[in-house]
Every structure is written in C-alpha cells, then in structure tokens.
C-alpha cells in the first residue's frame, strides 16, 4: 500500500506531520511518499524506515487565501498538486493539512468523482452517547440540492457501516424540528427522497446529534460546518469553565475530576479524530486539521489505510449505482 503525505500547509510545520507518519509506520506496514521540501524532510526522517519512505520535492505551497481552482491549475510544483498527480498514477491514498477548497477542487478536477457523484463531500465523525456519529457535509459544499443531500446520505451510510461497523445504521436529516413537515423547501424535498431508503429514520435537531440515536447526520456544508464548530466551541467553553471551577477545589477532588473532563473532551479534539475523507472520489483524499499534531496525523493515516483496506471506494460505487 502506497500513501502520500503533503507536508506543506501545516500550521505546525513538516516535522510534526512526519513524526506522526513515523508513528503510523510503527503500527502498520505501508509505503510512504513524503511530498514537500525534500532536503528538510530527509533531515527530519533521518534515515528512519529507509526502505519504506520515498521523497518528492515541491517548491510551491497553496495558501488558504488563494483561489482554489486557480491555485490547483497554476501551481503545478506545489506539494498538493504533485500529490494529486501522483495519486492518479499508482498510489492508494493521500493525506493533507492544506486548504480545504484546494483539496476539494483537486479531488474533483484531478482525482475525479465516482459515477453518479455530483460533488465530493467532506465528512467527520463526532462522539456521542452511543458511539461515533458521521456528519456530512461539514464545509465542502455550501450550496446544495436535494439530489446532493441524497448522495451524501448514501455515502455516509456506507462509511458508517464499513468503517465504524454500524450494521443497523440509522441516517437522519439535520433540521429545525423532528416532524416531517418541518424545514425549508430543500429539507422538505430531501426528506421525501430519503424516505425511499430503509435506513432513513427522519429529521434530527442539532441538540440531539450527540445523543447518538442517529449514526449518520446529513446536511449542507454551511449548516454542517456551523454544527461542527459549535460542538468544538462548546467543548472548549466547558473545559475553560471547568478549569476555573476546579481551581477552587482541594487537590484530592481535582485528581478525581480532571481525568473525567479530559476523557469527555478528547473525542471532539481534532487531534484525536485525525482526519476526514472527501467521500465520492475515485481514490481516497483525506483532510487533516491545519493545526494537527503528530498523534492526529498518525490517527489520520491509520484511518486512511483502513478506508483502503475495507475497499470503501468500491462499496460507495456500488451503493451509488444501486438506484
């Protein structure tokens, strides 16, 4: 198995990404190609896993403030563009911490979409009282149609069933109420289309997502991104509030409560989640948070490898053609 790692565009620099990849190599047998500043990257690796690691030099970086389409097309010596070009050859998957917009553009224009996929979507998993919940889209597609949301539901179902092991997967539509007649015209139209699938169980409100009654929550990228950021912000608020209250407790009480708070908040930390796939592409393209630490990169690569081993792309293809 051959994995590509884009080392340009990370907030923490190439070293943190490469150390995370080394940690993944210690846990799993695969071949890694590191794309970026070759001289710097070779120095960081320092001959570890020599038989498993290759290097490709890149002199350009795609920045977050650039036009994604223009950057992907014009910056042919950027690490991200080189990863996309290599992925189209004989590589199995690709992980980057770079621009979400550029990754979506590259996934669409270079890697290409699966048949019957109008646009790839970005998904994440969030913790709940009953295990992990798939949420999609979370930022790739702000403007969507009911047909797109129907595709997202199918792809989320396949991911949840095959990667998370949810055999009796339940899919819900994010809405302002649980009743069938609630929501705008997009939600009403989508509800009718999703009702044709046995795994669709109705609407779900944002406040109920973390209860875990639904294994997959489908929404547009605008609402999904707000939901995700609200969850992240709420966790940070609770952690900050708890710290201020804990400082007033005695040391013994702190020793009991602090581990509980850390355990509760760890699941929503992007460093423990790792990475998120763009579902609907012909080969796996995974996005990690720009501030990901080495543990996140390790987790992200291992998730990417599992995605490949479980042949999720082929299973998505079959689900999307089963009209």
UniProtKB/Swiss-Prot annotation:
It is found in: Cytoplasm. GO terms for molecular function: phosphate:acyl-[acyl carrier protein] acyltransferase activity. Pathway: Lipid metabolism; phospholipid metabolism. GO terms for biological process: fatty acid biosynthetic process; phospholipid biosynthetic process. Its EC number is 2.3.1.274. It holds the Pfam family FA_synthesis. Keywords: Cytoplasm, Lipid biosynthesis, Lipid metabolism, Phospholipid biosynthesis, Phospholipid metabolism, Transferase. InterPro entries: FA_synthesis, Phospholipid_synth_PlsX-like. It catalyses: a fatty acyl-[ACP] + phosphate = an acyl phosphate + holo-[ACP]. It is an enzyme of class 2 (transferase). One of its GO terms (cellular component) is cytoplasm. Gene3D superfamilies: Isopropylmalate Dehydrogenase. Homodimer. Probably interacts with PlsY. HAMAP family: PlsX (MF_00019). NCBIfam families: plsX. Catalyzes the reversible formation of acyl-phosphate (acyl-PO(4)) from acyl-[acyl-carrier-protein] (acyl-ACP). This enzyme utilizes acyl-ACP as fatty acyl donor, but not acyl-CoA. Belongs to the PlsX family. This is Phosphate acyltransferase. It comes from Finegoldia magna (strain ATCC 29328 / DSM 20472 / WAL 2508) (Peptostreptococcus magnus). The lineage of its organism: Bacteria, Bacillati, Bacillota, Tissierellia, Tissierellales.
């Amino acid at each position: 198995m051959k994995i590509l790692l884009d080392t340009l565009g990370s907030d923490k620099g190439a070293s943190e990404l490469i150390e995370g990849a080394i940690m993944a190599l210690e846990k799993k047998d695969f071949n890694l190609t590191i794309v970026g500043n070759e001289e710097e990257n070779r120095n960081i690796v320092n001959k570890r896993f020599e038989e498993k690691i290759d290097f490709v030099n890149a002199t350009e970086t795609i920045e977050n403030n650039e036009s994604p389409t223009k950057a992907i097309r014009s910056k042919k010596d950027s690490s991200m563009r080189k990863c996309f070009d290599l992925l189209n050859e004989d590589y199995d998957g690709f992980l980057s911490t770079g621009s979400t917009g550029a990754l979506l553009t590259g996934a669409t224009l270079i890697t290409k979409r699966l048949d019957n996929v109008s646009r790839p979507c970005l998904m994440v998993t969030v913790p709940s009282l009953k295990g992990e919940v798939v949420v999609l889209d979370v930022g790739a597609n702000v403007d969507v149609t009911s047909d797109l949301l129907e595709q997202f539901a199918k792809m989320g179902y396949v991911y949840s069933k095959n990667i998370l092991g949810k055999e009796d997967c339940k899919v819900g539509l994010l809405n302002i109420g649980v009743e069938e007649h609630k929501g705008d015209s997009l939600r009403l139209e989508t509800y009718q289309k999703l009702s044709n699938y046995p795994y669709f169980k109705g609407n779900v409100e944002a406040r109920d997502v973390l209860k875990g009654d639904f294994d997959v929550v489908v929404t547009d990228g605008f609402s999904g991104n707000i939901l995700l950021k609200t969850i992240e912000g709420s966790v940070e608020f609770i952690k900050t509030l708890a710290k201020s209250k804990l400082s007033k407790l005695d040391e013994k009480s702190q020793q009991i409560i602090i581990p509980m708070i850390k355990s509760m908040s760890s699941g929503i930390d992007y460093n423990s989640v790792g990475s998120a796939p763009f579902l609907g592409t012909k080969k796996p393209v995974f996005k990690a948070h720009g501030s990901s630490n080495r543990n996140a990169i390790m987790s992200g690569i291992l998730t990417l490898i599992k995605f490949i081993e479980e042949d999720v792309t082929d299973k998505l293809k079959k689900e999307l053609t089963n009209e």
